[in-house]
């Protein structure tokens, strides 16, 4: 039974919009300003301001479900293809980034040490993933339970405004004085996808057991 969920790299809680209060959520977020927004939006959740990568290592088997959404910018095929390749001969091209390999560190840690259910979510990368994952709803997933396909509407990330993204993600940031709201909203998992994955975790057994 899924009662306690760790929400790593929680941001403002896009993945948990439709979870309700049937699970106890511990949100781990490094950025104090973002964590304060999360706490205001989801007052019944426990919010921990900490390095999610280290917190996971130290609290690995304290939850029924671990959800991790590590930073995706260094892996993003959109950033690479539209920001770098398409502007290769332009001054406006984005700078190269080392892929943040903490993503794969966490997958390996969870695969070999986690005794409960877990899922890692990220953007579909511009390279062949170093560990094979499953593409569902415009994301790539690694988990120890089956995640079934789900149909979603267009995510609206490329041209979405703050207003349209707030409506799409089910999160209103209008009363918060924080910067880069558009990027924060773009980083949010779609609410119906977050609920779908939680339901898959509840209803599907750990693979191989």
What are these regions (language model features)?
Residues 1-209:
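Conserved active-site and SAM-binding loop architecture
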């Amino acid at each position: 039974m899924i009662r306690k969920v760790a929400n790593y790299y929680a941001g403002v809680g896009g993945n948990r919009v439709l979870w309700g209060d049937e699970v106890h959520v511990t949100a781990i977020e490094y950025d104090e300003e973002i964590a304060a927004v999360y706490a205001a939006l989801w007052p019944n959740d426990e919010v921990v301001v900490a390095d999610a990568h280290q917190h996971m290592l130290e609290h690995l088997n304290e939850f029924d479900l671990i959800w991790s959404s590590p930073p995706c910018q260094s892996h993003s095929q959109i950033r690479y293809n539209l920001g770098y390749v398409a502007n290769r001969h332009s001054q406006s091209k984005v700078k190269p980034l080392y892929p943040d390999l903490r993503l794969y560190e966490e997958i390996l840690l969870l695969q070999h040490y986690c005794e409960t259910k877990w899922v890692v979510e990220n953007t579909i990368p511009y390279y062949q993933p170093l560990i094979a994952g499953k593409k569902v709803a415009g994301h790539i997933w690694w988990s120890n339970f089956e995640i079934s396909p789900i149909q979603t509407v267009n995510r609206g990330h490329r041209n979405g405004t703050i207003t349209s993204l707030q409506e799409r993600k089910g999160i209103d940031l209008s009363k918060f004085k924080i910067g880069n709201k558009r990027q924060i909203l773009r980083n949010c998992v779609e609410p119906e996808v977050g609920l779908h994955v939680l339901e898959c975790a509840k209803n599907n057994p750990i693979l191989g057991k």
